[in-house]
């Protein structure tokens, strides 16, 4: 008998096993010693700098406050903390639905402070993010989508609240944000609020929070990989519920990192479930608009197996790739499975798939292309919202759903692949002024 995870004494010690074991030990040490980092407001997109585009000019005075109300759906079990209701790491068998309020800044932050931090270089203006309140409104069995007449009173109230906000929004659209690994419920709610805020508070934000742990070791040993995969049923249920019971014209999805595992599988499941329907009819019924895979941590082969289904269900599919995403490089080296969808290494295979299947609604944004002309790369794992150039494209895309040539992106030599040129700030500001006609 030998200990689990240790090579038996009669077998030669495998160098790859030793490397992974060493990494596990180092990650355990780092996660045990590292203090949780406070969440801070993302840098202002370059799109808004210089005052050429004001995303908040249209807001009524009542909405100019340093708080954001969002909706949420989670298959985390609820827990009571010192701050009140929240959701922990235990897996729930039901979908918990509710609303949360996120504070952008501290108790002394005024709207003018938040406004300044949202449209300028934030040196000295970093603002913390925290949950102000959480209110659960309903629970729903995973795997069921029922007619409105059969909804509980609580569920009807939840969808009625979404519809009330849709009626007041400039865009009658919902953004479902699916977070990555190593984060908690607060993180998923806060990032949803940030994205909604920086997009001009023009649609309804909804956080889908799956039960990831708050350390990378659980992901490395694939426990949270399995949790991500197992959460696809809950996300598929949510998307059907939103299509059935809300007035949203479009339901957009932003999947980040391991959230792409949840999202790609959920969309593939929905296509399989309704395989007898044409893509046109299903797309019209589910009303899934733009689906973004940002820094996606999904094995390329798995993702390509699902990409046809994703295309069938969505109006527009956007994949971001980088040549210097430290998290995806580490995942490829230490977890196996080959290139990740969000790596530049996967770009040629993705481009070939798109061309081979004659797909016209998928675009790839290579954030590393053009780096020599720009004088810098767009790197790291959080680049899609932390770097002010690519975050500009994300908020512009979510606000408008425009094609890349109308968002200020440059066309590469490869079909379907776009990048940010050295004059991107001027290009995106010019595009926004033209497309929005002076009004965000």
Which role does the model predict for each range below?
Residues 3-22:
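Bacterial N-terminal signal peptides that target proteins for export
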Residues 31-32:
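C-terminal motif of bacterial Sec signal peptides marking the signal peptidase cleavage site
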Residues 39-149, 166-168, 189-193, 197-205, ...:
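Lipolytic serine-hydrolase domain surface
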Residues 173:
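Alpha/beta-hydrolase fold active-site loops
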Residues 176-180:
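The conserved beta1-alpha1 loop
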Residues 255, 259:
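Gly/Ala-rich beta-loop-alpha elbow adjacent to hydrolase catalytic centers
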Residues 262-266:
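Hydrolases whose catalytic domains are alpha/beta-hydrolase-1, hotdog thioesterase
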